[in-house]
Amino acid sequence: MSDNTPTPQKNPDTNPYASLISQQIAIIPSFTLESGVTLNNVPVAYKTWGKLNEKADNCLVICHALTGSADVEDWWGPLLGLNKAFDPTRFFIFCGNVIGSPYGTISSVTTNPETGKPFGPEMPGSSVKDDVRLHYIILKSLGVRSVAAVVGGSMGGMTVLEYPLNTPPGFVRAIIPLATSARHSAWCISWGEAQRQSIYSDPDYKDGYYYEIEEEGGKVDLARQPARGLAAARMAALLTYRSRDSFESRFGRRAGGGKSSVPKGGVRIMGGQETTDPSVPSESDLAAKSPSWRAWREHNDGHRSAGARPISRSGSEGPAHREGDAAQAEVVKTQDVKANGNKIGTGGEAPPKIFSAQSYLRYQGDKFTGRFDANCYIHITRKLDTHDLSAPSRDTSLSSLSSGLPSSPDATEEELNARLIHALSLEPPALVIGIESDGLFTTSEQRELAAGIPDAELVVIPSPDGHDGFLLEFEAINGWVEGWLKRKMPEFYERRVINPEEYVQGEEGFGIKKESVFGEAEADVTRW
């Protein structure tokens, strides 16, 4: 047994994000990143289903996307179960959390053993190759001799492509990348930059040191973060995950209100708009406000940090300024500007109309800040930017195909393309799946993968949901993945490793049974 053998974590991390998941966490004594930085006592979160067969070669590795976790049941639940693509009675299923994610593996919210405080912005950058090498250590400790197939979409698809190149030759038998690319495009890099700038522009970001509260003597509070910036970044990301047609069909120009906290029981039927929400202004409240006040409120609708209205250009103080911050806090609440009529101009008394699409984005942004960390978001989007399958691994401790890829700092575009073609030629048999309406990882990028991998099949799934189709088109994806595995690996379908009668079956069918915590799938995308 080597000195670097993972050991179970004895004292669970107090990280509130990791506590959202029932999973296992192992500690790796030492791990060196592609950058050359060595990390000590590295926590790695993972989850498994099923069990290994006698040959220990029936492992299915599932790789999560940017904001996902090791809990496959949460974001790909309809694909996991008896007689489904990810069948625990036939396969030993493993999913590891990536470096930089707040859900258990080492990240910005992990306590730095040298300082006793979270790594924060001082967490060293990582690559997709690092994730593969880290998870390989865990797989070997679990007794896995070889992997039947690696499956994943988006960032998870990048991990899938790197697996055969960053583990010993022959360790991975087949791969199934979905909605991904061989190298991160300029389009995706630009969207990632825009999202990071949203976080940086939040005054609460504090260069990433927002965990420490100065007025409380440097006390660490992981719940403290630049929530407005992170919410804005999430909103921008959601627009890249869906398609124009998807938003138009679901929302159109319909009014929307969103979830709000209001007392149960009672309805106002006189003195103002009929409502069950006590925060909605009455007729007298609205009448007391000046036209300039109403214009100010409409202009700042959705601005989460709007305080008291400043003094006007004329030097006078509007009614809002005199009434103080409490009154202003009221007018910027989402529930205060629910569908209260059709007046949008500043001259009317009705609050500004909020479109359903706006309300959806605001709700999703707020929801995201409760389950993800801003520094972690920055870390992982930068990880995505570094993705290039043709880049050789700097690690020489493990004999892998990636470490043998040609490298030249002054390579021309033609040489870079040749390196990519060479890297793809080293991949094992593959089922490449794309989403027809995906504007983030286009079908042309899926064609590039399939054309470069020697034994590859390409499937394009029609879906109006854009990139998120890989998380929503469960039935189609299940059918193609299971069918391909049966053709390529019939031996795993000749006998089971777990008696079906002993397996606790979850929900049947391919519909979304519950709202996902870590994925994009919603039981009803218009419910919020």
Curated annotation (Swiss-Prot):
Q: Recorded E.C. number(s)?
A: 2.3.1.31
Q: Does the keyword Lipid metabolism apply?
A: no
Q: Which reaction does it catalyse?
A: L-homoserine + acetyl-CoA = O-acetyl-L-homoserine + CoA
Q: Where is the composition biased (Low complexity)?
A: 389-409
Q: Which InterPro entries match?
A: AB_hydrolase_1, AB_hydrolase_fold, HAT_MetX-like
Q: What happens when the gene is disrupted?
A: Methionine auxotrophy. Attenuates virulence in a murine inhalation model of infection.
Note whether Transferase occurs among the keywords: yes
- Can you tell me which residues form the catalytic site? S154, D438, H467
Please, which domain of life does this record's source organism belong to? Eukaryota
Q: Where in the cell is it found?
A: Cytoplasm
Annotated Polar residues bias: 273-282
According to the entry, every stretch annotated as the AB hydrolase-1 domain falls at: 60-245
Q: What class of enzyme is it?
A: transferase
| Family matches, as Pfam families | Abhydrolase_1
Basic and acidic residues: compositionally biased ranges: 295-304
Keywords from the UniProt entry: Acyltransferase, Amino-acid biosynthesis, Cytoplasm, Methionine biosynthesis, Transferase
State the activity regulation: Inhibited by 6-carbamoyl-3a,4,5,9b-tetrahydro-3H-cyclopenta[ c]quinoline-4-carboxylic acid (CTCQC).
Main subcellular localization, coarse class? cytoplasm
What biological-process terms (Gene Ontology) are attached?
'de novo' L-methionine biosynthetic process; homoserine metabolic process
Show the GO MF annotations.
homoserine O-acetyltransferase activity
**Pathway(s) annotated for this protein in UniProt:** Amino-acid biosynthesis; L-methionine biosynthesis via de novo pathway; O-acetyl-L-homoserine from L-homoserine: step 1/1
Q: What does this protein do?
A: Commits homoserine to the methionine biosynthesis pathway by catalyzing its O-acetylation.
- NCBIfam families per UniProt: homoserO_Ac_trn
Q: Which family does it belong to?
A: Belongs to the AB hydrolase superfamily. MetX family.
| UniProt-recorded name of the protein | Homoserine O-acetyltransferase
Organism of origin is Cryptococcus neoformans var. grubii serotype A (strain H99 / ATCC 208821 / CBS 10515 / FGSC 9487) (Filobasidiella neoformans var. grubii)
